[in-house]
Amino acid sequence: MVAHAGSVAVRLLADRSGLTKELGKATARRLFVPVHDRGQVLVDVAVMLADGGEAIGGINVLRHQGQVLGPVASAPTVWRALDELTPAALKRIEVARARVRRHVWAQLPKLPASQVADTDLGGVVVLDVDARLVTAHSEKGQAAPTFKGGFGYHPLAV
């Protein structure tokens, strides 16, 4: 089992949609090859925020998932990557995001229609998400139990 499994889906979405690569190109600098691609660092920050992180130090949660996510930059590397963002780089990031968004939207007509009981649902997209909670075996600070009295979290909602 993988804790915070939903964060893997966010990272895969960024990678497979081309966002990570486009951000890497938008933040690339001449004659400088960083250990961690700056596009990947920005995606990791977004994944960390989607995973519930509230500070740059929250990136360490992703670093503990290295077997699933691969190498994740340290907090100081994230700070350096953010410090490197100039107004021109932010504009290139904006253009890169728009390019990827257009690409993703262009792929939607290629999706097969959803069907239920051999009935075509047309443009409706069906998401079948498992609602089970992952049990946490200890009460966390100021946590309220679920309606069943246990403690846990939904891996796609954290």
Give the positions of each predicted feature.
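Dynamic "connector" segments at or just before major functional cores
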Residues: 1-158
